[in-house]
Amino acid sequence: MLQGQLSFEEFTTENPSQSVDLTHANDGSGRIFVVEKGGTIWIYDQDGNRTTAPFLDISGRVRNAGERGLLGLAFHPNFANNGFFFVNYVNRIGSDGQTIVARYTASGNAASASSEVILLTIDQPYNNHNGGQIHFGPQDGYLYISTGDGGSGGDPGNRAQSLTSMHGKLLRIDVSTAANPTAPGYSIPSDNPFASSAGLDEIWSFGLRNPWRFSFDEVSGDLWIGDVGQSTREEINHTQNLPGINFGWKCREGFLPYNGCTGSGFTDP
């Protein structure tokens, strides 16, 4: 089978500052949205020209230190009509901050910080391993959220394997307003693996260390997760987007047992 050819076109931006994510709104506008870790989102045209004012500025809410900051952006599949988009950031509450997943509403090339509706708040026990990516599933339209194991090193709380912790997970929620028009602003898809059993309803898969970035194959729906390793292996996990997958941390790092763990039932990278 012949492999397809891939080409790249250089995209030069002006005055980037800690850019951590880049996406589009899928609204036919051709706009490119660049996320800066300090708490701003800018719009660029396809020639690399930036708007004079940011699309969103929540720098006053964001803790920009180490791995923390504004980390993810996803546009609602119906953004062209409802103006909804979602962000993932670490706030300034407490010594290590909280992960916030929030919805905002855009009007034209701007979104007011006052339009924030907070969907999820996850306390962070340490100052690292925050995950941060968010995407809508191309086949189900649900919002997926990656979370790190809570930090330090070696997952001292074994949070990634715990089904009562949101850390070290891929979460999956339904943010359609029809599903739940009131707080908390989302509902649980009925086919989430722990929706009717022990474990947090929001969990889709688990056993992740710091899934800083993930994405979907838009055609097949397959899931690709980049998971930061402890000391010997980095991971790229590629699977069908199936419920309840255990990616192994902190029992496995890549293909290797971690710290003498001999568990089973893990999906290797």
Task: Tell me the role of every PLM-derived stretch.
Residues D27, V35-G38, G60, R68-L70, ...:
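Beta-propeller domain segments
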